[in-house]
Design a protein with these regions (language model features):
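GIY-YIG nuclease catalytic motif and its immediate N-terminal context
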Residues: 1-43, 49-52, 59-71, 76-88
């Protein structure tokens, strides 16, 4: 399984979109400053998660989210029924 995720940094007031097969490890790396793009925004909070069977499917979804470049669209996605965090 591959997960597309959205992180939010209150400190930086911005979102980060990514995909990984190891979500917990990836989130730890983001919060330890292991990614140059997210380093300045720690701590990051996981606000959206959606799982896919293949890397190809996940990459398509990630690209669609990243290309949106519309904050309102990203917020709607976070609050949508596709967000697997809502079912926990």
């Amino acid at each position: 399984m591959v997960t597309v995720y959205i992180l939010y940094s209150k400190k930086a007031d911005r979102y980060y979109i990514g995909q990984t097969s190891e979500l917990e490890n990836r989130l730890r790396r983001h919060n330890r400053g292991g990614s140059s793009y997210t380093k300045s925004g720690t701590p990051w909070k996981l606000v959206y998660r959606e799982k896919f069977e293949t890397r190809s499917e996940a990459m398509k979804r990630e690209k669609k989210l990243k290309n949106a470049k519309n904050l309102e669209y990203i917020k709607r996605v976070i609050h949508s029924s596709r967000n697997e965090l809502k079912s926990e």
